[in-house]
From Swiss-Prot:
PANTHER family: MALATE DEHYDROGENASE. InterPro entries: L-lactate/malate_DH, Lactate/malate_DH_C, Lactate/malate_DH_N, Lactate_DH/Glyco_Ohase_4_C, Malate_DH_type2, NAD(P)-bd_dom_sf. The active site is at 188 (proton acceptor). Catalyzes the reversible oxidation of malate to oxaloacetate. NAD(+) binds at residues 12-18, 106, 113, 130-132. It catalyses: (S)-malate + NAD(+) = oxaloacetate + NADH + H(+). One of its GO terms (molecular function) is L-malate dehydrogenase (NAD+) activity. Substrate binds at residues 93, 99, 132, 163. Belongs to the LDH/MDH superfamily. MDH type 2 family. Keywords: NAD, Oxidoreductase, Tricarboxylic acid cycle. One of its GO terms (biological process) is malate metabolic process. This is Malate dehydrogenase 2. Its EC number is 1.1.1.37.
């Protein structure tokens, strides 16, 4: 007996990240190889023809799990009964644009999308914001959807998490899949703090394997933080395939579970680790039965506190920068 199809809404459907994302969702990488999906694709009116072209390609893959596709420029159509919403589309920063202008341009998009989710999405909708500034965009959407549980709104730090994993694997020679208990704290921006104090690889302490505090502070943390900029510099385009892969990882783990393994998600704070409530902040979590749970009680040393407070300061500044645009 086939499962009933799940509805997956994707915004920015004509964009580069979506182009790497949609085929994998239709292939079952997001929700499982036995779960049919209906894709509900949102983009601007001027991008509708491009979305139609992507849909033609999706059709030409003849994916057994793709049960239907909706193309629209109306958030209320895109988010209707959505089980998962991947908010990929955002206003990119153009040359000479101040950060506050970027924040207000995105606040406009995410208040509308949050309100539409509030009105028409499934009450259990799992929302992942990929479009930058992701944490604050997720905060805006959450605040614009008062009837949905706050825990439904998350921001993507999985790309930072995966970048940190690959740097640690390269440094230690350990297989990337063997590394456990890595955390990435804070904002999805160069201020985030990748933290391997608790990490292990094949049962060995990552701190002992690396044994190089200067590398941690001067190479590892900046490399992970500035990796996106390094890719733009090398390729002339932003990281789209790796971002799409991280989005798949984030939602798949949220839905299907992590078997006790730590992953990083940007989630609304409950006040723990000294982070004010509701701020969407990257923390280590485990997932089971479709729910995430923050890893509690980790010791925060002085260096970590400084890094965690630094990324928090940026998030508070962003929050205050959009406060006047939010109703509640």
């Amino acid at each position: 007996m086939a499962k009933p199809a799940k509805r997956v809404a994707v915004t920015g459907a004509a964009g580069q990240i979506a182009y790497s994302l949609l085929f994998r969702i239709a292939n079952g990488d997001l929700l499982g190889k036995d779960q049919p999906v209906i894709l509900q694709l949102l983009d601007l009116p001027q991008a509708q023809a491009a979305v139609k072209g992507v849909v033609m390609e999706l059709e030409d893959c003849a994916f057994p799990l793709l049960a239907g596709v909706v193309i629209t420029d109306d958030p209320k159509v895109a988010f209707k009964d959505a089980d998962v919403a991947l908010l990929v589309g955002a206003r990119p920063r153009s040359k000479g644009m101040e950060r506050k202008d970027l924040l207000s341009a995105n606040a406009e998009i995410f208040t509308v999308q949050g309100a539409a989710l509030n009105e028409v999405a499934s009450r259990d909708v799992k929302v992942l914001v990929v479009g930058n500034p992701a944490n604050t965009n997720a905060y805006i959407a959450m605040k614009s959807a008062p009837d949905l549980p706050k825990k439904n709104f998350t921001a993507m730090l999985r790309l930072d998490h995966n970048r940190a994993l690959s740097q640690l694997a390269a440094k230690t020679g350990k297989p990337v899949a063997s590394i456990e208990k890595l955390a990435v704290w804070g904002n999805h921006s160069p201020t985030m703090y990748p933290d391997f104090r608790f990490a292990t690889a094949e049962g060995e302490s990552m701190l002992k394997l690396v044994n190089d505090d200067v590398w941690n502070r001067e190479t590892f943390i900046p490399t992970v933080g500035k990796r996106g900029a390094a890719i733009i510099e090398a390729r002339g385009l932003s990281s789209a395939a790796s971002a799409a892969n991280a989005a798949i990882d984030h939602v798949r783990d949220w839905v299907l579970g992590t078997n006790g393994k730590w992953v990083t998600m940007g989630i609304p704070s409950d006040g723990s680790y000294g982070i004010p409530e509701d701020i969407i902040y990257g923390v280590p979590v485990t997932c089971e039965n479709g729910e995430y749970k923050r890893v509690e009680g980790l010791e925060i040393d002085a260096f970590s506190r400084e890094k965690m407070d630094g990324t928090l300061a940026e998030l508070l500044e962003e929050r205050d920068g959009v406060a006047h645009l939010l109703k509640n």
